[in-house]
Structures are given as C-alpha cells and as structure tokens.
Amino acid sequence: MGMAMRCVLVLFSVSPVLLLFNFEMLEVALHLASREKELDTAAVTPSASLSFLSRFRIMLGMNHHRSRGRRHKRCSEAPAPAPAPALVPAHQARSEAPAPLVHVPRKGMPSTHRSHIAPARSPVHKVKDGGHTKIPRSAIVALGVVGLCLVVLGVVIAAFSVRRSRKFKKVCTKAFKPFHHGSRDQRSPAATRKVSSHPSPDPLTLSSIVQYQQNLPNLKQSSESKSLSIQSTIPMGTELIVSDHAVINNSQSDEVESFHSIPCSDLSAGSITELPQQICDRRAIMNRSEYFLQTHDSPSDSSYQSLSPDCTSRLSPKDQTFTASSHLSLRSKTCPEKSDGENAEINCHDGLEITCISGSMEHKEAPIEERARINFRNPPSQHIFPPSYRTDTSQSKINIAFTMTNSEVESSSKESSRIETSSSMGIPKPAPPPPPQKNPPPNLKGQCYGQPPPPPPLPLQIQVGKDGSPLPRLKPLHWDKVRAAPNRSMVWNDIRSSSFEFEFDEQMIKSLFAYNLQGSMKDEEAMNKTASTTKHVIEHHRLQNTTILLKTLNANTSQVCNSVIQGNGLSVQQLEALVKMKPTKEEEEKLLNYDGDINMLDPAENFVKVLLTIPMAFPRMEVMLYKENFDDEVAHIKMSFAMIEGACTELKSSKLFLRLLEAVLKTGNRMNVGTLRGGASAFKLDALLKLADIRGTDGKTTLLHFVVKEMARSKGLKALEKLNETPSSCHDTPTEREEYSSMGTEFVSELSNELGNVKKVASIDLDTLRNSISNLSCGLAQLRNLVEKDLASDDKNNNFLQCMKSFLNHAENTMQGLKADEAQVLLNVRELTEYYHGEVSKDESNLLQIFIIVKDFLGLLDKVCREMRGTKHNQTLNLVLPLK
C-alpha cells in the first residue's frame, strides 16, 4: 500500500472523530441556550442529556416538533398552570425543572384574554423577541466545520488522483526511452505480437500506456503461466494500420525517425504478456474518436506513413531497431475496467488485427518512394485521419495514423475485450542498444519536418574571356555603387559597354593586379615544410624586418654583391634597405661561424651571411649611401643659409618696416605717458604682437588699427603732395583724411611682400640645420677611415678605393666651404638680433626667434589691412544705395 493511500485512510478515520467533536459542541451550545433563556421546561425531556441519534437529527434539522397550528407562533403565550407541589425524593431534586416564569407582555401590544398551554418546542428552537425561532450560532459554526472537513477531504482525493495520473505519465515516458536511444537494428522478429478486438462504431485508439515491471511475483496476479493464442480474420472492407513513431527527446529534437506501417495480415500469432496496471480513460477515448470522425483531411505532416503489403514484404531484419521495456495495450472505447485485478482477455469477434511492439523488433526501412505509397482496398470510400492521440511530454511523442474504409463497423455493447497475460519464466532480455545517432540522415529530416530538403548552393558564376578561358581574380577596387534612377536622367545612362573603344591589355592587368594565389600557396607550403628544419640565428623580430627589406631590393644576391664590391650601381632606396639589414655583433659572429648547411638557414639569414663574406660590407654600404645623399644634403643646407642671409638683409634695409617701428614707438610713448614705460627710445620686437590686444571703446578698433591708419594717412598725404606739388594744410577735413588713408593702405600692405624671406626663415629650425652639418662631418670622417685604414689596396678593392678617394676630395672641400658659410650666417643673425634688441647673450638657444616674431606680426598686419579695405567698400555702398 502506498503512502498516498495510507494518508487517505487516515483522513477517513479522522472524519468521524471530527463529527463527534462537533456533536459535543452542539450539545454544549444547546445547554447554554436553555439556561440563558430558561425556556419552557415542559418541552424538555426528563433526561438532561440527548442521545446520539437525537443529536444527529438535530444537526441535520430532521427533528421538527412544531405545533399543528400556526396561530401559536405569533400570539402571546399564556403561562401554563403550575402543578400542585409534591414531595420528591432528594436524588430527583436536581432533575426537576424549575417553576415556569410568568410571561410579561410587551408594551404597546394589546393583551388578549385567551390563555392556553403553549405547544412544546424542540430544544433547537429558541424563543426570542416575540416567539420567532432561530438556529443557534454555535450550530451554524459546527455545520460549517463539518462542511469544511468534507471539502478538504474531497480536495485531497482529487489531488491524489492528479498526482497518480502524473506519476503514471512519467512512468510511461521512462518506458519509451529505449525507443529513442535504441536503434532499429536491435529488433527481433519474436517481439511482434498481435491483439485482435471487436471493432466498435468509433475508430480504435490507443487507450493506455502502462509500465512493465520485471518483478511479476510481487503483483496480485496468478503465478500460473498461460498462453494466449489470438486468431484474427480481416474483413474484406476494413484494414487498420498502426504506425509506430520514434520518440523525440528534447536534447535531440532534430533526431526524428520515420514511420513504418506493418499490415496485420502478414503477421503470425504470438504471445502477449499481461501488464500489471491498465488504465482505460473512456472520456479521452471518446473525445479522440470524435476528432477522428470529424477530421477527414489527409495529414500534411510527412512524419508518419503507411506501407502496403507489397512494401512490407521487402523489409529485412538488418535495418534500424527499436528496443522497449514497456508494452503497449490498445483497447477500444468500450473496453471495461477490472477492479479486482484479474487477468483480462481480448476476444476477437470481427478479426480486427493490431500489431504491438514489445521488447525489440527488427524491420528494414523501405525507400522513400515505396514508403509514400498506400494500398487501398476500397479507394472511393477510405479516409486518412491525422494523428489524434499524442502523449505530449518533454521526452516522448507517439503518433498513430489510421486508415479506415467505408464499410460500417457493427458495435455491440455487450461484448467485452480482455487481455489474459502470463509471466513466462524464460523471457530473454533485449540486447543493450547502441549509442544514438547524433544526426539523422538528410532524407529523414525532410520527411519528419514535412518540408523538402534545402536546394544545393548555386555554383559561382565564372567570368569567361574572349578566348573562352576563365578570367583570373584581380585585386578589387572598392567603390559604392549608384542605383539606377528610372525617373531621372543621369550621365551613366549615356555610357554603354560598347562605347568604350579602349581594349584592356589583359596580360598587363593580370601581371600587375592579379592575386598570386598559387605562388603564395607554394610559398606557404615551402615555409611550412622548412619551418621545422630551419635554424634561426637572427632574432625573430629583426628577421621579419630583414625579410621585408629583402623583398624591396628587386635584385638578386649576386647583383648586390657586385655593386658593393665596385662601389656603385645601387640606388638610394636599395642602399637604405641594405643598411637597415646590418646585424648586431653577436649575430654577425654567429653567421660567420655557422658551419652547417646553408640551406637550413632562413633566406634572409642566408642573404646576410653572403654579404658578410665581402670585407667591410656594411661599412661600404654606409659610405656609398653617404656619397649618394651628400650633394642633396649640401644643397639643402646652402639654400637655408641663403634664405637666412636674405632675411637679415631685408630687415635691415626695409624703410617701410622702419616707419612702422617709428609709428609704434611714438604711439606707445603716448600711451605710456605718466608711467615708467614712457619716454622709451627702443623696444623689443615682441611688443608688436601686443598691439592687437589693446582695443578701443567701440570694441572693434585696436591699437594696431590706429597705427596702420596713421601710417596710411601719412603715406597718402605725402603721395598727394608729390603729385600736386602743393604743401598740405594742417587742418584736413575727415573726407580728405579718408582719401589719404585709402591711398596709404596699399603702401602698408606691401610690407608683407618686402619681407618674403623672413617668412621662409621662420620655418627653419636652426638646431636641425646644425645637426645636418654635423652628420655630414661624421660621414666624411667614416669615409676617410674606410679608404685610408680599413680597406687594403688590393685588386678586389681597387675599384672601390678609386671611386671613394675621388669623392673624398670633393667632400672635404665642400665641407670646408659649408662650415665657413655656417659661421658667417650665424654671425649675421647675431648682428641682426643685436641691431634690434641690443646686446644678446651668448647662451641664447635660438637665434632665429626674431624672424618668427616678424612673421607673426606680418600676419596680423595683413589682416588689419583687409578689414580696413572691406570697411571702406561697405561705406561706399551705403552712400550710393540711397541715391537710387
């Protein structure tokens, strides 16, 4: 007996106790009510306690002792005559009822002279306020408690039923797991069994799925083994095909098995084992049968199919196998349930045959074309019903497809089907299933999900040239395509493919922009093959850089070696790449001392090792690079010196700049009147940059604007005097002053053109210029040492020495003149700085700072001149427009 059944029995036993407890509470309540109100004692029985039957009748309201007349209910009750006192024994004194009380009528109610004895009332009814009777509140509470107990008991029974059904479903799910994990190859022919039942008006459905238990002796069944032989005959107009479906697991949702139908007519009689528990849900069967009768459309899902007898004859026992540890019991809608646990039998009356799988069964899966075929014995009247019964759990699904004919099936309510089972002692255990397949075949996937397999990918379109050969892939040109606008005229509409007269040189475009896929693949394969056999001497990062530089040479090893020996024949870019390949002293020693196979080294290391065989190879390359860059470096330095000298000359000889300084000096002294800064005779040029920071009261005009206007007016006045040859008056009108300033603004703006070299010199870094001269001197010293000391005068080095000695003489003379020019330029810059700033300390880092100041001031001056010209132009327009 299970734990749940024990709990139910305990509840059943506790319920009477609760009822008795409620009866006791009811008795106490009635006793208290009788004492409080002191009702009529005549209605009370001589005994103070009520019997059990009376209490139960009172609780259910069955004890009604009401008077036959309703007139006593509303009328006032007259007191009953008191009996004559009598002597009673002492032991009966307590049991006697007290004397009746005199009834006091209500106020405002007419008194009646009628007096009679009130009828005796039940102790359940209370006399309250005019004779109205009500059930006591304690009785209502007791009845509510009893009802609540009954409701709780019903809920517990319902929960137990639901729990038992869920547990049964879980057991069925576990029982079908071997169908999922097993394969179809493990089925045995002896596992097929046939069950015949009398057909009913409704289609036959799968009514129950029960668990097979191995410990059959523990069940309430007979230990006697019986064999059941079921013979069936199939009517001519009826054929039932049951298809088995593979169970789908959640973890392997895509592993779907196809269905196979096995006709019942080709199977022989077998034995069926009794299942320990059988449940027949008649309501579910009726609903499913109604769904089958209402649904006549062919199933759209291709996961279940029926095979004809022709197809089943082609099955072989070497195909997929299902292994199960549970048995399926198929019943009709009218199968009765047996509560006494006896064995049941299914009597076959009309020969309807069903094939069940118990244990393992082997059959061969037919091809797709054959599985799609269905044999109909009565084509005009048959219907194919979709699967309606589906045990929907997280681990298993079972679909059953039925093929029915038009022949009516006679039903009989008197007939009953029973399954008589016996436990055979020699039941062989099925073999362990093989591991499940991870991916089903592609044809099964398409069948299970009801959709055709995906089409194969389209082949890439290969472009073909004029000769019919495929065009190679070139490096792409990344651009954004423009969509054609049908409602708009575009320039691209006039361009046609045939309008391009120029024909591509296919060979040239292949050689320039084709992907060298084969070459790169060969190089990668060669690198992979030699990766394990090569020995690296140079550090990995430096080796990568050397490999990259080696590709930029565009020359083989012999050409490079000959050029290094001769001292010429290499460009500046090649010499720069070779100089960067120079190894460290340790790497040079390792390469020179390497005695192994030279092919074992990396190609870059091999190249460097060959170069090291030339005496002083890398010093040669360095002096060769120095020779190639010497003339360019000297020309750049001399040009810089020339610009510096020109800037010094311009600043010293510019009269306009001198007039500007004069105007600034006078204006500054006027601004600094009354301060320590007033009365200055000179100022540093960096004060010119501060003129734009001092603004007037209007917020627009700066001190630089004022200085420029005064200079322009002065220049314009002088120019006008030269043209008219008349002296200027001291009192000029504002209009005349504007004319003078407009004429003089052009002269002031010319200062930027006069000091053109000053702007160029401002971009020169004197420290960089000095470093360039120092590098040339160091390279010349290295060349002198190489020619005079390092290289011996032999036949191999003769050409190199002659070439370098001639260059050495030229370089020495050039460097001497370059150093003299450097000294002269620096002297001129110092003199210019002293000319404007006075004495300059020798520790001043940048002597060219004066040129930077003048350049910035010229930029401010040009901006002010443009603003002044624009303002005058706007004023002219404002004067002309009103006249129109």
Curated annotation (Swiss-Prot):
Biased composition (Low complexity): 300-310
Subcellular location: Membrane
GO-annotated cellular components: membrane
UniProt record, GO biological process: actin nucleation
Keyword terms, alphabetized: Membrane, Signal, Transmembrane, Transmembrane helix
Pfam families per record: FH2
Entry keyword Signal: yes
Signal sequence extent: 1-19
Keyword Transcription regulation: no
Pro residues composition-biased segments: 429-443
First-listed, main subcellular location of the protein, grouped into a coarse class: membrane
Region: Disordered, residue numbers: 179-204, 295-318, 403-473
Alphabetized GO MF terms: actin filament binding
Membrane topology: Single-pass membrane protein
Domain FH2: 464-884
Membrane-spanning residues: 140-160
Family named by the database record: Belongs to the formin-like family. Class-I subfamily.
Name under which the protein is recorded: Formin-like protein 9
